[in-house]
Regions:
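Domain-level signature for proteins that mediate thiol-based redox and metal-cofactor handling
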Residues: 1-194
């Protein structure tokens, strides 16, 4: 008789995505004070296309944590960062539970620390984008490394009137969304000056 439910036991017994990604360029950690476990997520993200090429993890957690990390890693490989926009704890937990079965209240932190580690890795990638940016004008979209000059050029060339139109042209505003108000401000300024 297995200690864990069948699907969790299967992933716990034969994990496929442990270790570091070969070309890791984003790392994030999530930890639980409930049981003392941690998950560290290693991502390889294509700098041009912003596609997650590989996702790996390390953990000292239980079978529930390992299974949740396995499902997370499998689900995000091949996804573009824009595909993950707006993913929150509840949606993530729902996806994990649809794959593994419902986690009891005392096991939810096992999945939540995986999501925390993913968020931290994406934050790490954004920080790398900011560090690598070298330009005269401000960096508006840190998720995709899009400068004020680029956005102004798109607004002028395409007569973009919405943040969504700018996003369709260069992905700005389609990641975390924190730059959307700045993009709208640039659109409004262009409209006033035209």
């Amino acid at each position: 008789m297995a200690f864990y439910p069948d699907k969790i036991n299967e992933l716990f017994s034969a994990p496929k995505r442990t270790g570091k990604a070969a070309k890791t360029n984003a790392v994030g950690t999530g930890a639980s004070f409930v049981c003392g476990s941690f998950v560290r997520v290693y991502l390889e993200i294509d700098a041009e296309t912003k596609e997650i090429r590989d996702a790996r993890y390390k953990t000292n957690g239980c079978g529930f944590t390992i299974a949740a990390a396995e499902v997370l890693a499998e689900k995000i490989v091949g996804q573009k960062l824009t595909d993950l926009h707006g993913l929150n704890h509840a949606e993530f937990l729902g996806e994990i539970e649809s794959e593994l079965g419902e986690f009891s209240a005392d096991r939810r932190h096992c999945a939540e620390i995986c999501f925390d580690a993913l968020q931290a890795a994406l934050t790490d990638f954004r920080a790398l984008q900011i560090e690598e940016f070298a330009g005269e004008k401000a960096l508006i979209c840190t998720c995709f490394g899009i400068s004020e000059d680029t956005i102004q050029g798109i607004i002028s060339e395409t007569s973009a009137e919405t943040v969504e139109e700018v996003g369709d042209a260069c992905n700005a505003g389609t990641g975390c969304g924190s730059c959307r108000f700045l993009i709208q401000e640039l659109i409004d300024i262009h409209r006033l000056e035209s």
